[in-house]
Amino acid sequence: MSNIPTELKYASSHEWIRKEEDGSYTVGITEHAQELLGDMVFVELPEVGDTVTAGNDCAVAESVKAASDIYAPISGEVIAVNEALEDSPELVNSDAYGEGWFFRVMPSDESEVDALLDAEGYQAVIDEE
């Protein structure tokens, strides 16, 4: 069974967010998602300064099995990207909730966070797959 940290919020499309001290949110894909995809070989990230919209694709994760769109769980401006993934995309596999994060977003509408799933709700999504 996948690890689903309770302090994070989740999108049904298998992204997670974590609130940071500056009010921004770090975004990544869940352990469940990386298990489905398999070994990462390339990650295409948005650019710093890009505006992302909740539910729209904004990044791509390519694995030995498939290329998968990554969707923005919330809307806002991208303020940082995980440049370490350019050389080490396998960080997504080894540390999905830590060093394998994708980007950080300053939210334009924080109420979107409330629409995301808690750990229990995300587990229910996985169970239905």
Curated annotation (Swiss-Prot):
SUPFAM superfamilies: Single hybrid motif (SSF51230)
Cofactor note: Binds 1 lipoyl cofactor covalently.
Keyword Chaperone among UniProt keywords: no
Protein name as it appears in the record: Glycine cleavage system H protein
Ranges where the Lipoyl-binding domain occurs: 24-106
Record-level GO cellular component terms: cytosol; glycine cleavage complex
This protein's encoding gene: gcvH
InterPro entries associated with the record: 2-oxoA_DH_lipoyl-BS, Biotin_lipoyl, GCV_H, GCV_H/Fam206, GCV_H_sub, Single_hybrid_motif
Family in the record: Belongs to the GcvH family.
Species of provenance: Shewanella sp. (strain MR-7)
Alphabetically ordered keywords of this record: Lipoyl
PROSITE patterns cross-referenced by the UniProt entry: BIOTINYL_LIPOYL, LIPOYL
Domain of life, per lineage: Bacteria
